[in-house]
């Protein structure tokens, strides 16, 4: 049975648990515990990680209430284990399963799955790929919390393949999430080194224990990331509880991270609410993304390279935002910006970009002034499909960008303006600074070059650079007055709510409809006579 089949079967088991009140997120947490136990069993590593009496067969041999009680005891015991990595994975873990039949069904079904491909058993990487598939499934179903900003795997793959991590390079993700960037970086290095077999023993040990470092603020997410790393044979620094540390990048934890040769990350979007920015940055700001940008510049080794997913506001925000962009273009060679399409994150409407840069320059890694000369921009946003479940974002959508980016990880491959994928030639051009004195044919290209001097004089150091006109865009001058727009929107909402109310009553949910109507009346301060 291949991994896709196993992922589908494991996910299907969730239906039984959901009937018992277990959410998708909690189900993934349950699977994280059970999959670790099963992985140790199938790969013959139980003695390496698990104490006697707390292994897969010990859980499987019990039934009913005894099995559920033992499972609870097992989680507590492993969370206090002498092995720091096991302790980190199971620290403060508890189960949301309340009925013995649920854990019995889960264990027996997992045990009955065909974990083998022909005569070959599953490797740790096989279990890791399977686990990543489950995380992807969870992101598809969980459109709030961490799930809404789950970085699409095709984008992660492209970023890592362009950065080209090498053996003995430290790769850092200061907003690790479920460790997707680190896992892909490890996968890339293994693909270039015959699964590390071409490396000497000391370098192999470096790759397993020191090459990949992440920091994650949320304990539950950090646990998922640790499990992901461990299942991919990335153990990390055992003194720090594995490859993913728990802490706040915008505080002292971020300052204590070791310097990196590569940073690949997707910092959390949104305001600074809930995030305690206690670190002193050169340009103090409450904008989380701008603080992360400063951290990345600081944490890179001279000559190190980075790719960072940022929302549009990082490109144009004034004040400290302008200062930080100037700092970036001074201290780093910002060579490439990829404008991403909307809809590729589960938070619909989020507009994002990827900034690719090198600290200093390749010629002089310690250079800290005037490092940026030309910035190349690829527009993968304008007039692209609305991506989502029905139109998935795939590797093919990124291939034209990969081709023009070139083979050099610092963006120094020979480049030529002009790339017309996805019917770009049919696109109208905007009346903007970007298109002044520009050949009409080139103005329809998705791939353009802009000088540092032009960015300074024409854009006042804004990096919000676009030149193609969206066919669905509306001229602001032709819009109605704001109060008219607001009234129209309110009218459409009232109509939609009325139709939903009628539908709920037709479906026999009158009590729920009455409750929702009451909540609406309370929200608007009651109905006025």
Swiss-Prot record:
Induction comment from the UniProt entry of this chain: Encoded in the hsd locus, in the order hsdR-hsdM-hsdS. There is a promoter upstream of hsdR and another between hsdR and hsdM. This probably allows expression of the methylase enzyme before the restriction-specific subunit.
Residues involved in S-adenosyl-L-methionine binding: 148-153, 178-180, 216
Disulphide bonds in the chain: none
Keyword Methyltransferase listed: yes
Pfam families: HsdM_N, N6_Mtase
Catalysed conversion reaction: a 2'-deoxyadenosine in DNA + S-adenosyl-L-methionine = an N(6)-methyl-2'-deoxyadenosine in DNA + S-adenosyl-L-homocysteine + H(+)
SUPFAM superfamilies registered for this protein in UniProt: S-adenosyl-L-methionine-dependent methyltransferases
Annotated GO MF terms: DNA binding; N-methyltransferase activity; site-specific DNA-methyltransferase (adenine-specific) activity
Single biological process term from Gene Ontology: DNA restriction-modification system
GO cellular component annotations of the record: cytosol; type I site-specific deoxyribonuclease complex
Spans through the membrane: none
Keywords: DNA-binding, Host-virus interaction, Methyltransferase, Restriction system, S-adenosyl-L-methionine, Transferase
Family: Belongs to the N(4)/N(6)-methyltransferase family.
Assembly notes: The type I restriction/modification system is composed of three polypeptides R, M and S. The restriction enzyme has stoichiometry R(2)M(2)S(1). The methyltransferase is composed of M(2)S(1). (Microbial infection) Interacts with Escherichia phage T7 protein Ocr; this interaction leads to the inhibition of the methyltransferase restriction enzyme M.EcoKI composed of M(2)S(1).
Physiological role: The subtype gamma methyltransferase (M) subunit of a type I restriction enzyme. In the presence of the R subunit the complex can also act as an endonuclease, binding to the same target sequence but cutting the DNA some distance from this site. Whether the DNA is cut or modified depends on the methylation state of the target sequence. When the target site is unmodified, the DNA is cut.
Name this protein carries in UniProt: Type I restriction enzyme EcoKI methylase subunit
Classification lineage: Bacteria, Pseudomonadati, Pseudomonadota, Gammaproteobacteria, Enterobacterales
Annotated gene: hsdM
């Amino acid at each position: 049975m291949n991994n896709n089949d196993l992922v589908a079967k494991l996910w299907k088991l969730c239906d039984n648990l959901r009937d018992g009140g277990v959410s998708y997120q909690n189900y993934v947490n349950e699977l994280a515990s059970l999959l670790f136990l099963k992985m140790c069993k199938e790969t013959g590593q139980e003695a390496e990680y698990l104490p006697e009496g707390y292994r897969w067969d010990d859980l499987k041999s019990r039934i009913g209430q005894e099995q559920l009680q033992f499972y609870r005891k097992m989680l507590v015991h492993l969370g206090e284990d002498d092995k720091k990595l096991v302790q980190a994975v199971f620290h403060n873990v508890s189960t949301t399963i309340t009925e013995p039949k649920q854990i019995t069904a889960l264990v027996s079904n997992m045990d009955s799955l065909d974990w083998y491909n022909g005569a070959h058993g599953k490797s740790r990487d096989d279990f890791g790929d399977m686990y990543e598939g489950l995380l992807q499934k969870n992101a598809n179903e969980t459109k709030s919390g961490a799930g809404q900003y789950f970085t699409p795997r095709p984008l992660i793959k492209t970023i890592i393949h362009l950065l080209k991590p090498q053996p003995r390079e430290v790769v850092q993700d200061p907003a690790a999430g479920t460790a997707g960037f680190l896992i892909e970086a490890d996968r890339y290095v293994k693909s270039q080194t015959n699964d590390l077999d071409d490396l000497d023993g000391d370098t192999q040990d470096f790759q397993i224990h020191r090459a990949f470092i992440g920091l994650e603020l949320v304990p539950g997410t950090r646990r998922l990331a640790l499990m992901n790393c461990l299942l991919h044979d990335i153990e990390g620094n055992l003194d720090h509880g594995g490859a993913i540390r728990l802490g706040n990048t915008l505080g002292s934890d971020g300052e204590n991270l070791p310097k990196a040769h590569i940073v690949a990350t997707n910092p959390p979007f949104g305001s600074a609410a809930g995030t305690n920015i206690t670190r002193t940055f050169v340009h103090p700001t409450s904008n989380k993304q701008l603080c992360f940008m400063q951290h990345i510049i600081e944490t890179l080794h001279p000559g190190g390279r980075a790719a960072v997913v940022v929302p549009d506001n990082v490109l144009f925000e004034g004040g400290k935002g302008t200062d930080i962009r100037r700092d970036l273009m001074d201290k780093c060679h910002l060579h490439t910006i990829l404008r991403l399409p909307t809809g590729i994150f589960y938070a619909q409407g989020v507009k994002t970009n990827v900034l690719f840069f090198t600290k200093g320059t390749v010629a002089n890694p310690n250079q800290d002034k005037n490092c940026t000369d030309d910035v190349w921009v690829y527009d993968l946003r304008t007039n692209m499909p609305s991506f989502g479940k029905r139109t998935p974002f795939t590797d093919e959508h990124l291939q034209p960008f990969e081709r023009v980016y070139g083979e050099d990880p610092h963006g120094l491959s020979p480049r030529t303006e002009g790339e017309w994928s996805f019917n770009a030639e049919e696109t109208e051009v905007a009346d903007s600074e970007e298109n002044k004195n520009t050949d009409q044919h080139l103005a329809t290209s998705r791939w353009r070059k802009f000088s540092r001097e032009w960015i300074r004089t024409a854009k006042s150091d804004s990096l919000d650079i676009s030149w193609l006109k969206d066919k669905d865009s509306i001229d602001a001058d032709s819009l109605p007055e704001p109060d008219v727009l607001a009234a129209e929107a309110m009218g459409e909402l009232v109509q939609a709510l009325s139709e939903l109310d009628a539908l709920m009553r037709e479906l026999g949910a009158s009590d729920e409809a009455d409750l929702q109507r009451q909540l609406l009346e309370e929200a608007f301060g009651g109905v006025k006579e």
